[in-house]
């Protein structure tokens, strides 16, 4: 009997997958696997839709020994703000590595990508920052600046200057 496909919204994912030390450790483990295992990761597929200033990127990878893999679909339509819509969104499809059956749809609207990027910054800081560093400078004021700040606080205490 086939199990039903799990559908998680951005709200669900924000509740279930916070930007915390476990997320930072997970991303570090993923980088380690990419560097040390025979990870299958094809080039990014990019579909341009020039008449609407749009593009869609599709990314995936498979790590041997992990029961599932995901396919990320990431559209960017850069005139959308003039329509009152976000310029980017996205979703991921989680499949069984054994059967190829769809297990879950993650309707994250880019949240998981934002989380991964912030956690990757924390991994870099963990390995490249001086151990006695007491502050971090973050240039920018958007979503990534805020998320980088949160991710760093999980590594060590930093002062915040606005």
Question: What do the PLM-derived regions correspond to, one by one?
Answer:
Residues 153-162:
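Conserved small/polar residues in nucleotide/adenosyl-binding loops
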Residues 141:
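Glycine-rich Rossmann-fold phosphate-binding loop(s) that bind the pyrophosphate
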Residues 116, 147:
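Residues that form or flank phosphate/diphosphate-binding pockets in enzymes
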Residues 144:
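Hydrophobic/small residue at the entry helix of a nucleotide-binding pocket
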Residues 1-113, 120-122, 129-132:
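N-terminal ligand-binding/catalytic initiation module
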């Amino acid at each position: 009997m086939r199990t039903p496909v799990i559908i998680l919204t951005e709200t669900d994912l924000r509740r279930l997958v916070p930007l915390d030390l476990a997320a930072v450790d997970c991303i570090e483990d993923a980088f380690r696997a990419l560097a040390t295992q025979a990870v299958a990761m094809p080039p990014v597929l990019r579909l341009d839709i020039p008449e609407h200033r749009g593009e869609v990127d599709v990314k995936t990878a498979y790590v041997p020994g992990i029961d599932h893999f995901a396919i990320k679909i990431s559209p960017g339509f850069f005139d959308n703000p003039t329509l009152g819509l976000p310029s980017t969104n996205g979703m991921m499809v989680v499949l069984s590595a054994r059967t190829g059956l769809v297990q879950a749809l993650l309707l994250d609207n880019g949240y998981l990508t934002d989380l991964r990027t912030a956690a990757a910054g924390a991994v870099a800081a963990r390995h490249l920052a001086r151990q006695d560093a007491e502050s971090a400078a973050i240039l920018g004021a958007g979503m990534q600046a805020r998320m980088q700040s949160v991710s760093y606080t999980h590594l060590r205490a930093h002062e915040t200057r606005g």
